[in-house]
């Protein structure tokens, strides 16, 4: 039995990640594909993250970084097991978000990456570009929904994309929604059909 693919959607806040993940789930109706999003706010760490994001509590940046990282590690075994059982996972945000946001706040990218060493490595990361309209939507109730901060996050994403050690697929914000939906579906299907070898380890 071939393993499943780990496909991650990344991008700035309000770039359409969740929408595109749901489009994939609806267009590829199969019992071998599942959706997962981070942070998982139902866990102990997730509830702490939710309190922070919604401004109910404050933590220093180092603690916040570790909370997001721990939240992903809580699901590392689940992800590994699902992939080995032939289940493809469509993941809304992953380690790259954690690193980009931490680095945008001034943390060392190298240090932030080290917390994620060994997580299941994605077979494909789809990065959804944000047009000026989407970026200007980034004013909201949650703590990171700020235009200037999101621009900093974007620069950190670009650094990771340029490193070339992960298979990134950038989706332009200029595509019409129906074109974007079809393009992403085709990219995901190809990734599922071409995945080979054991599950890799992130940044190892």
From Swiss-Prot:
Its EC number is 2.7.4.9. It is an enzyme of class 2 (transferase). Keywords: ATP-binding, Kinase, Nucleotide biosynthesis, Nucleotide-binding, Transferase. ATP binds at residues 11-18. One of its GO terms (biological process) is dTTP biosynthetic process. SUPFAM superfamilies: P-loop containing nucleoside triphosphate hydrolases. Pfam families: Thymidylate_kin. GO terms for molecular function: ATP binding; dTMP kinase activity; nucleoside diphosphate kinase activity. It catalyses: dTMP + ATP = dTDP + ADP. The keyword Cell cycle does not apply. Pathway: Pyrimidine metabolism; dTTP biosynthesis. Belongs to the thymidylate kinase family. This is Thymidylate kinase. It comes from Camelpox virus (strain CMS). The gene is TMK.
